[in-house]
Amino acid sequence: MGLESYEARYTLQLTEWNQRVFERRGLDVVYVPGLTLDNSQKIVVGQVLDAHGRSYFGMSQMMNLVRLMQQGEVTAEDVIYFEDMFQPGIESLPYIMDQVPAELRPRIYVRCLAQAIDPDDFVHVWGMAGWMSTYEKMVNHFVTGVLATNEEMVAHMRIAGWTAPIYNISGLAFGKEEVLERIGGSANIRPFADRPRRVGFAARFDQEKQPGFFMDLIEMYGELTTEPCEFAIYSGGALRSNNPEFVTRARAMEAAGKLKIYDNIGKNEYYDHLNNTRVLFNCALQDWVSNTVSEADTIGCNVLYPAYRSFPETFANDPNRLYIPWSIDDAYHKMQNLLREPHHNMGLISDWNNGTVDRVVDILLGLGEHWNRTGNRYRDHVAEAKYHVVKIPM
């Protein structure tokens, strides 16, 4: 049960990333289709997914799933996997399964991307948290398992009182090979020394991503050094925000020559920009792993993110590419270091996230119980690095 495709979002590539792994693993997969309101692949109402488009696609997709269930095509031997926990029309599943024989009740897994358990999610900005948290409790009553992207998200789910089994997949679905294909292969990764001194920002320009912190960093850089550096904003659509003051400030800074805005860019063009960037910077309050880190790490960029929520796990507790939240001084000094040379562990983050879909498959097949965070010892795994990194003695 995949998400509808948006040009400016990762859903355009998500099916491809999943499909490659499903085929390699030899799975018998049915991709349940949905209907779209139009062919624009654009977000018109809302920030993350289009409000009308998500509802229309999700409900039409559920209609097709219900038809398959009614025809006996879905049985207890099957798994229904929802790419997003928020699926309009999903309440039809317990309504049906509570009334059919046990042999017609499939296992159901949902992947959570944020929602009401995250105090910085957009559902709180728009006042949706009350009904969304109720929706989440409903889903917990009938699913086989919920997939979290990291240990900190697991903790948020547990303190919210979620009752379904929770699994940490430790990453977002990502296809490193597909991303490299878009730049013509790894041979086309531009050498770090040949790249301009450029720091990029690729998060949405909404308040939960703290774009003001990035602009403060730009101002600080201009005050402390005369060494040239381009600061760039990358946006799939026109630059916009749930706080228009950020856009106004960014446009004024661009007019003053302090930064460059690259908006309305397609994914391939974005990858070309990353291939000419030395550091991708992030300062988000709300970012559970983030595909931006995997893409930049794949294409030869250094990445500098806050040591906050999911990122210590994503970075395997790397002290050089994680800065103290929210210390602009620490961010500045580490940015300066990362502008000089490529980090010795470049590529390992994207390698790890490239295995996320395999971890999902293992869980769906009953082979991933070591990722199960049910029970009272779910915090035992927080400090452990999920993959090995190269250590350089001081």
Predicted regions and their residues:
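N-terminal pre-catalytic "stem/leader" segment of glycosyltransferase-like enzymes
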Residues: 1-92
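Membrane-proximal helix-turn-helix segments that form the acceptor-binding/catalytic region
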Residues: 125-146
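Donor nucleotide-sugar binding/catalytic pocket of nucleotide-sugar-dependent glycosyltransferases
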Residues: 141-189, 194
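Glycosyltransferase donor-sugar binding loop
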Residues: 229-247, 263
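A charged, aromatic-enriched C-terminal amphipathic alpha-helix characteristic of glycosyltransferases
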Residues: 326, 333, 337-390
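Aromatic "clamp/platform" in nucleotide-sugar-dependent glycosyltransferases that forms part
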Residues: 284-286
